A protein has these predicted regions:
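Bacterial N-terminal signal peptides that target proteins for export
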Residues: 1-8
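Bacterial N-terminal signal peptides
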Residues: 9-17
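Glycine/tyrosine- and acidic-biased, solvent-exposed loop/turn segments at the edges of beta-strands
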Residues: 19-165
C-alpha cells in the first residue's frame, strides 16, 4: 500500500513538472494563480516566462519552471526544504527531453541520464550518497534500492508541497 501511495505521488508530481531559465525571460514569482498567469504571459509576450514557488517555512525556492508560448520548455528544477536540488531536467515543447538528474538530500547526485519523449533512454549513472559512481547501466537495470530512493525523495517533496511547507 505504501509503495502504491508513493507511486501515486510520483505520478502526480510528474504531471506538474515544469522548467526554468532563459536570458530573454520575464519573471513571475508566486503561488496559486501565478502559475496560470505565467502560462498566459508566455503566450502573450512570446518569450520565456519563469514561474517560481518558494517554501513557506524557509523562503527558499521550492521549484522553478519556464513556460514558452504556454508550454513547458527548457530546464526545470525542484528543491528540498534545505535548498539542495531534488531533481532537474529539461522539457522541449511540453515533453521531457534532455539530461535528467535526481539528487540525495545532501546535494549529491543520485542518478543521471537522458530522457527522450518522456522515456528514459541509454545508459544511466547511479551513485551512492557520498557521490561515488556505483554503476552505469540502462535505466531498467538500475538497482531497485536506487529507484526506491528516487521515488521516496520525490514523494517526500510533493508531500511537503501539499502540506504547505
Amino acid at each position: 500500500m505504501e509503495k502504491k501511495f508513493k507511486l501515486l505521488l510520483l505520478a502526480l508530481g510528474a504531471l506538474t513538472l515544469f522548467s526554468a531559465c532563459s536570458s530573454t525571460q520575464s519573471d513571475i514569482r508566486g503561488e496559486g494563480n501565478q502559475r496560470a498567469l505565467a502560462i498566459a504571459a508566455s503566450k502573450t509576450l512570446k518569450k520565456p516566462v519563469i514561474y517560481e514557488k518558494k517554501w513557506k517555512t524557509t523562503g527558499k525556492v521550492a521549484m522553478m519552471d519556464t513556460f514558452t508560448d504556454g508550454k513547458l520548455d527548457g530546464e526545470f528544477r525542484r528543491y528540498y526544504l534545505n535548498g539542495n536540488l531534488v531533481m532537474r531536467g529539461y522539457w522541449k515543447d511540453g515533453v521531457v527531453d534532455g539530461i535528467w538528474e535526481d539528487y540525495y538530500p545532501n546535494g549529491k547526485v543520485l542518478m543521471s541520464g537522458y530522457m527522450k519523449g518522456n522515456k528514459e533512454i541509454g545508459n544511466w549513472k547511479y551513485y551512492n550518497e557520498s557521490g561515488q559512481l556505483l554503476g552505469e547501466v540502462p535505466y531498467d537495470q538500475i538497482p531497485e534500492e536506487i529507484i526506491d530512493i528516487k521515488h521516496t525523495n520525490l514523494a517526500n517533496f510533493w508531500t511537503d508541497i501539499q502540506n504547505g511547507k
